[in-house]
Amino acid sequence: MNHRSIFETVVLKIQELLQSKNFLDAHRLENHFVRKRLLSMYQVIVFLIYTTKQKLDTNIGNIRVDLPTLGFPKAISKQAVSKARQGIKPSLFQALLDLSVDAFYNNISKKNYWQEKYSLFAIDGSRLCLPPSKSNFEEFGHRFSRMNPKREWSEALASIAYDICNDYIVHGLIWYSLSSERKMAKCHFSAMEKLNLLENAIFILDRGYYSEDLFRFFYDKGCFCLMRLTESLNIAKKCSKTSLNTTLAGNPKNGTVDIPIRVIRVDLGNGTTEYLATNIPEEEIPTGLFKELYFKRWPIEQKYDEIKNQHLIEEFNGRTSTSIQQEFYINLLMANLASLIKADADEVIETNAKPTNKYRYQANRAYIIGRLKKIFPPVVIRQLPVDAIIVIFDESSNVKSQIQPGRSCPRKKGGKGRERKHFYNRKTAV
């Protein structure tokens, strides 16, 4: 299947699941949505998919106009909507995300690879600023301002496994703010193992992930990994040349054995030196390619930028831990759907590109996200046919932005550090 066909498959399957009593019953709390109320579970789910970053009252008013066939009740308060959504398990939206992943990897006819062989997966975490509430404090942790202890908020640790070559989120987690990113990485790996995605896979992880335990984990699983090292580690200090082949000593008390480890020294050209640890042998990938390979992980940073600044994931509409998790998985689902549209549009743009063009072009992702957010909900409830959303594929190939190679933005250091960003009484007007 091509990207359009996969997109259509995902939409049709979502339509089917949201009409399935067995599916809905599996993802509702006990004693919720068992009586006939003003709001049905189906209406609440569609509302959560539809809702924008505006105030809740505005969204309630808009959904009656934009989705008249949904039959959203008029005499309903925002408190009733907020209470009703608590009866829906976040696992429902996680299941929809998993559906998009299964549909892609089981049906894609032409996957992208690095060096025409390797699947590249990046794993990385990022903190999300949450609205202050008792529920979030208990589930995700309690934070205070350094300057003013009375200013309090919560943070969650989000982590995703990302297919670099195919611009697709494979798995996502949102945990307590002080959770172990290494433990989350193992959970991502287990999920991908079930999807049979490990053949010729290389996992790329940033500084902070390396530990002997995690390195052994990948080695024991027979899977390639590449981890950035901190300069203070002994194995990094020992690497005075371009590469070093050494051994991680085993410990009989822990049941571990000696395993080989390869350390690569990379000079960035600006006076900075980085060290990489890998279990990939020299005959598989030569030393000279590791600088290129490591920098292939940069798209996961761009994916977090997309999720935070285009999907505005931190502008949560709900204040409870259940609401946070619901919206987290909805945003990852929308990011994957947008990626399907962009991949198709990019192919059209590349096919129609002229050799005389100064720059290469790509589809404008912000445009795709905005159009998708508007058209997806009425298609889900069958108010519009699936063809209505397929139109975005054709439109997106005409809304382009330049690809300018070599652009960079130095990271700002210092400053006040992380402060509260989520203000519940400050919502966008659009």
Describe the role of every protein-language-model region:
Residues M1-I60, K74-A75, R85-I88, A95-L97, ...:
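Single, function-defining residue in the core of a domain
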Residues N62-D66:
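Short alpha-helical "recognition helix" segments of helix-turn-helix
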Residues T69-L70:
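Blade-loop segments of beta-propeller domains
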Residues S119-F121:
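Conserved beta-strand elements of the Class I
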Residues E139-S145:
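Short Pro/Gly-enriched beta-strand edge/turn motifs at strand-loop
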